[in-house]
From Swiss-Prot:
Organism of provenance: Pseudomonas putida (strain W619)
Gene Ontology molecular function, alphabetical: metalloendopeptidase activity; zinc ion binding
Biological-process GO terms, alphabetical: proteolysis
Subcellular location: Cell inner membrane
Cofactor note: Binds 1 zinc ion per subunit.
GO cellular component: plasma membrane
InterPro entries xrefs: HtpX_protease, Pept_M48_protease_HtpX, Peptidase_M48
Membrane topology classification: Multi-pass membrane protein
Keyword Iron recorded: no
Keywords for the protein's UniProt record, in alphabetical order: Cell inner membrane, Cell membrane, Hydrolase, Membrane, Metal-binding, Metalloprotease, Protease, Transmembrane, Transmembrane helix, Zinc
Binding site residues for Zn(2+): H147, H151, E224
Protein name in the entry: Protease HtpX
Length: 295
């Protein structure tokens, strides 16, 4: 909770500085001279409220959404020795990482994957695919679990939700400024908000949204390296590298995990070129090389 409060306070300060900066550069006066009556401070607050609301609501219901979207079955009472081993392993890794035992589940998917989610590092969910359990060795599964525990211990779910809230805020803010500019300055509309405002705002939100997604995904890729490091510390560097190498062997298999969960899975799929800018995970080769350099 302290992380959320500090992050929100920081971004309120950013909003305030942005508003003051625009005012100092005479942006308000320029828009007013062209018939646009905008209160930038009020607009920023409005966008911040709605920008953060969506990402924070998604964060608080993330465990429920994950269970529903992936069909994850929570292990309350282990029925097999594999489930017993899974619970014991997660408990050991959680204790080493200094967090409370998360919920543990298995989701029905052929591809080898796993994810962690939850609004709090002490109230999380870690789940693995059936395919991962069936085809990976115990050491490889343990390394994957350590990676996911690393996400939880690092607070990545909260951090990414807050980063998403920030970019949502500024996408909404600048899209509405562009919409007003097009409507009032270019089309000279003097009565309310015309069709040009709505069209320009929608187009601007789409374009800015893509650019914002690149920022969020860049940040997500940085967090993957940190989770790999945490996994190496908990399970051993050799085991973590072995798990990533095994994932690389299976890289051609389709990833059926919902898009909302891919940022927190260990296997994010494969894209090249510009599409790689929208990937939540770095290439497996780069992750393996980073661990080798770390030693």
């Amino acid at each position: 909770m302290m992380r959320i409060l500090l992050f929100v306070a920081t971004n309120l300060a950013v909003v305030l500085v942005a508003s003051i900066t625009l005012s100092l550069f005479g942006f308000n006066g320029f828009m007013a001279a062209n018939g646009v009556d905008l209160n930038l401070s009020s607009l920023l607050v409005f966008c911040a409220v709605f920008g953060f609301a969506g990402s924070l609501v998604s964060l608080f219901i993330s465990k429920w959404m994950a269970k529903m979207s992936t069909g994850t079955q929570i292990i309350s009472q282990p029925r097999t020795r594999h489930e017993q081993w899974l619970l014991q392993t997660v408990e050991e890794l959680s204790r080493e990482a200094g967090i409370k035992m998360p919920e543990v589940g298995i989701f029905p998917a052929y591809e080898a994957n796993a994810f962690a989610t939850g609004w709090n590092r002490n109230d999380a969910l870690v789940a693995v695919s059936q395919g991962l359990l069936e085809r990976f060795s115990p050491d490889e599964v343990r390394a994957v679990l350590a990676h996911e525990i690393g996400h939880v211990a690092n607070g990545d779910m909260v951090t990414l939700a807050l980063v998403q809230g920030v970019v949502n805020t500024f996408v909404m803010f600048f899209a509405r400024i562009i919409g007003n500019f097009v409507d009032k300055v270019i089309f000279k509309n003097e009565e309310g908000q015309g069709i040009a405002y709505y069209v320009a705002t929608i187009v601007a939100e789409l374009v800015l949204g893509i650019l914002a997604s690149m920022i969020v995904m860049w940040f997500s890729r940085r967090r993957e390296y940190r989770a790999d490091e945490a996994g190496a510390q908990l399970a051993g560097t050799a085991a973590m590298i072995g798990a990533l190498q095994r994932l690389r062997v299976e890289q051609g298999l389709p990833v059926h995990m919902p898009d909302t969960m891919k940022a927190f899975g260990i296997n994010g799929g494969l894209k090249h070129g510009l599409a790689g800018l929208l990937m939540s995970h770095p290439p497996l080769e780069e992750r393996i090389e980073a661990l080798r350099r770390r030693g």
